[in-house]
Amino acid sequence: MRGTTENTDLFDPKTQMDPDFTRHGSSSDGDFGFAFNDSNFSDRLLRIEIMGGPSDSRSEVEGCTSIADWARHRKRRREDIKKESGVTISDIVACPEEQILTDEQPDMDGCPGGENPDDEGGEAMVEEALSGDEEETSSEPNWGMDCSTVVRVKELHISSPILAAKSPFFYKLFSNGMRESEQRHVTLRINASEEAALMELLNFMYSNAVSVTTAPALLDVLMAADKFEVASCMRYCSRLLRNMPMTPESALLYLELPSSVLMAKAVQPLTDAAKQFLAARYKDITKFHEEVMSLPLAGIEAILSSDELQIASEDAVYDFILKWARAQYPCLEERREILGSRLALSIRFPFMTCRKLKKVLTCSDFEHEIASKLVLEALFFKAEAPHRQRSLASEESASLNRRLIERAYKYRPVKVVEFELPRPQCVVYLDLKREECGGLFPSGRVYSQAFHLGGQGFFLSAHCNMDQQSSFHCFGLFLGMQEKGSVSFGVDYEFSARSKPAEDFISKYKGNYTFTGGKAVGYRNLFGVPWTSFIAEDSQYFINGILHLRAELTIKRSTDP
C-alpha cells in the first residue's frame, strides 16, 4: 500500500538529536512494536531486495548452530566474495556512507523512474551492490554482487522518526535535504544471508528486543546493527551474548569484534568479558600448555594481561612468550615485529631477575634498541625506593599498561645486594603482603625467587607451622639451597624483620649451617608469638600492610675463624 504518500512527513529534519545516539535498548526507550509494519503509523515504504548468489545459501546460514559454525561460514563467505570481485566484507563495512546517494552520485534521470524528479513514485536507492544489468548504465559502487540477482522482495511500512532516532544511518538518509529524503519509497538491497538479521534489527528499533536466542543469530544481528549504525542494538546483543556460557572459541571470536565493526565501543564490554574468561580459564598456563601454545595472538595477550596469572615468576612469562613467538612466527623479522610492538607489553620486565634481564640484552628475537630500552626501564624501577615504586605502580594501575603491577607469582620477587669483599656475602629483602600471609594458614608456604651466592642458588620460604612445643600455629622462615650436584659449604646467616614503632630491621635469629643440595635451615616460629598475634590488625610486624623480611648470608671460608 501507498496510503501514506499523501501524508505530511512525520519526521522533521530540523529536529536536533543526541549526536552520540546513546540509547541502550531498554524498556525506558518505549515500546513501539505495535507500529511495526503498520501503515497507520508509518510515513514511508521500505522495499528490501534480497539478492541471491553463489555465496548466499540460506540453508547454510540457518545451519549455524554454534559459534564455530558461524565463524567458519563468515570466513567462507568473505573468501567467496573476495574471489568473485576482489572486495571483502570489511570493505563494505568500512564505507557505509557510500550506501546513501549524494550529489556526486549519477543523475537520477539515468535510473529507472528518474525522468520526473518530482514524482513521489521514484525510489531512493540505498544499495549494497548493483546487479550486472545495471552496471553498464551506472557508476554506483560495486561491492561484489555482480553475479547476484534479486530472488525475493519484501516491503515494510516504516516510521522515519523511529528509525532515525535509533540510527544515524537512517537519520542522515531522511534528513539530508535531498530528494531521497522527501520520497516515500526507500530501497535496501541485501544478501540473502542478511535477511533474518535485518528483520530482527528493524523489529528491535521498534520494540527494543529481539526474538533470537542463539549466539550465531545474535552475532548476525549485531553485525547488521553495526552496518546500519544502531549502537543500542549492538549493546543489547552484546549483553545477551555476555550472559551466555562462554567457550574458548567464542571468547576468541569476541576478541576479534573490535577490528571487525565500526562501532567498537558498543562491543567493548563483551570483549572485556572474553578477556576475563580466557584469563581465568588459563591462569595456570602450565596445566594447559599445549592448548595455550595453539592460541592466537589476541588470546595470548588476554591471558598475560592478568594480574592473577599463576606462574612461577616473570622470568617464566618471558620464557613462555619467546617459546610461543618462535612457534607461531618462524620468520625472524615477523617475530621481532610482534615481540616489539605487541608481546613486549605483556612482559613485566621490572619484576624479572637481573640475571634474566642480562639475557634479554643478548636475545636476537628482540631488536637491540627495544631490548635496551626495556631493560633500562626495568633497572631504573628496581633502583627506586619502595614507596616510590608503589607510587609509580598506583599511577599505572588505572591505565591499560600494567607493566609496573606485580603479579601473584608462585615465587615471590626478592631484592638482592651482593658483596665480594672482604668475603662473599649478600643481603636479601623479601616483602609479603598481609593477604599473602593470611592465605598461608593453616599449613601453607610461599617461596622466594632464587638468588645466587658463591655460584650456588638459594631461596627463602615462609611457612605457617604448628609450634611443636606450644601446639599453636605460628609464622616460620627458612633458607634453602637449590639442589645442584654434591657441593657443600658453610654459610653464616641472619634473619631480621622490620617492626613498629621504630620500623627498623631487628635481628630475630642468626646461626651457621653447612649446606648440601636440597637442604634448608630456619625457624618454625620466627617471631615467638602465636599466629593470631602475628596476623592481627595491630600486629607490630605489618607496616602499611607489608611484612618486611631480610636475610644476610656470608660464605664461610676455611681460613675464617
Curated annotation (Swiss-Prot):
Residues 268-360 form the BACK domain. Gene3D superfamilies: 1.25.40.420, Potassium Channel Kv1.1, Chain A (3.30.710.10). Residues 145-214 form the BTB domain. InterPro entries: BACK, BTB/POZ_dom, POB1-like, SKP1/BTB/POZ_sf. Pfam families: BACK, BTB. Pathway: Protein modification; protein ubiquitination. The BTB/POZ domain mediates the interaction with some component of ubiquitin ligase complexes. This is BTB/POZ domain-containing protein POB1. It comes from Arabidopsis thaliana (Mouse-ear cress). The gene is POB1.
